[in-house]
Amino acid sequence: MAHSLKSATFLIESRIADAARGDCNACYDLGIIYSTGASGTAIDLIEAHKWFNLAAVWGSEAAQSCRSDIAEDMTAREIAEAQRQARAWLVQTGRRAA
């Protein structure tokens, strides 16, 4: 179990680093990880929505679809929080929406 947790942590950290460099696919992958609980990661729809939102603003149609799908299972407050986190991440990393 500890090995898979280390693997999941490494995967997430490496995809976040890629996302910070502007990799749209990394954002999409993070959305998938958090929306499905891949690699033993806890499902977190706010975090998933944040990453799908970032991938979507950089042009990923698949992320737009996934974001819409998970939004059906979220409250308006949760969606607003995910959007706030996405904006904060853009500011923090100096990235801009496409």
Name each region found by the language model.
Residues 20-24, 37-38, 52, 58-60, ...:
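Short helix-capping/linker turns of helical repeat alpha-solenoids
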Residues 43, 47-66:
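Amphipathic, hydrophobic secondary-structure cores in small proteins
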Residues 71-98:
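Alpha-helical linker/edge segments of TPR/alpha-solenoid repeat scaffolds
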Residues 29-37, 66-71:
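Hydrophobic face of amphipathic alpha-helices that form TPR/SEL1-like repeat modules
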Residues 4-14, 41-50, 77-81:
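Structural signature of tandem alpha-helical TPR/SEL1-like repeats
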